[in-house]
From Swiss-Prot:
This is 4-hydroxythreonine-4-phosphate dehydrogenase. Pfam families: PdxA. It catalyses: 4-(phosphooxy)-L-threonine + NAD(+) = 3-amino-2-oxopropyl phosphate + CO2 + NADH. It comes from the Bacteria. Keywords: Cobalt, Cytoplasm, Magnesium, Metal-binding, NAD, NADP, Oxidoreductase, Pyridoxine biosynthesis, Zinc. Its cofactor is Zn(2+); Mg(2+); Co(2+). Binds 1 divalent metal cation per subunit. Can use ions such as Zn(2+), Mg(2+) or Co(2+).
Amino acid sequence: MQNHNNRIVITPGEPAGVGPDLVIALAQQDWPVELVVCADPALLLTRASQLNLPLQLREYQQDKPALAQLAGTLTILPVKIAAEVIPGQLDVKNSHYVVETLAKACDGAISGEFAALVTGPVQKSIINDAGIPFIGHTEFFADRSHCSRVVMMLATEELRVALATTHLPLLAVPGAITQTSLHEVISILDNDLKTKFGISQPQIYVCGLNPHAGEGGHMGHEEIETIIPALATLRQQGINLIGPLPADTLFQPKYLQHADAVLAMYHDQGLPVLKYQGFGRAVNITLGLPFIRTSVDHGTALELAATGTADVGSFITALNLAIKMINNSNE
């Protein structure tokens, strides 16, 4: 990696939550890349003081060569916050600030100014309370990048789970799963496992939608009418697919030891297993974007803000994975 390709942009997320704490904790060690934090400088300096941690900020200079990040320092891409932040207390006046940091970081990642984007947790409810329609990071970045399809995947060192659908009510899931959508999702998953994870021939295990994967049509017809035909077409294109398998049996070592990724049909089908197995060590990845995006696997934890007790493990894992994905993409 060279110059701007040695830069990762970070958004701390909700200012009243643990995001700023975790970014400051990241700064307490050396990093081989430049960490450019898109945030209000005063917010970070105040929070560092509250945490009794050293922090020096240097302003981001796009035209200068990227520098490895030294412990105790961060590079700042400034965005001014609207109202004073009280740790643990949401303020609707700061919702536009949160969205502005996401937009600024996303635009820099799209342009190639940054090699990857790593996000801290946001509070979706307070953003919507401000009158800003916001489903989540995944959908926001997809819309801003003009991507008609992206794929949400969570990963630990041992397991990767991608989703055929994301933040939908359960009632809406069957209608959202079509042969076209599965073709798009699985093609993105297969491509990004190759290009961003360095897996030359990924093997993807696919969950059925219904109990027992439909039990031959006795517990639903989506497998027979949609999932099985879609997988057959994709296999003809050279994608290694196993399934559809019942979700309650797929998540066993005899299957997972061979799986480079699992495709779950909906959010709560696959993610509870992954989070139980590796909560605090999991990373949220958005596949199909024109840039690398990783994130923590937890929420804003308002009650922990400025207490010094927040666990930085997931943020460190997300940042390390982003660096690894950058290296894989450059090979």
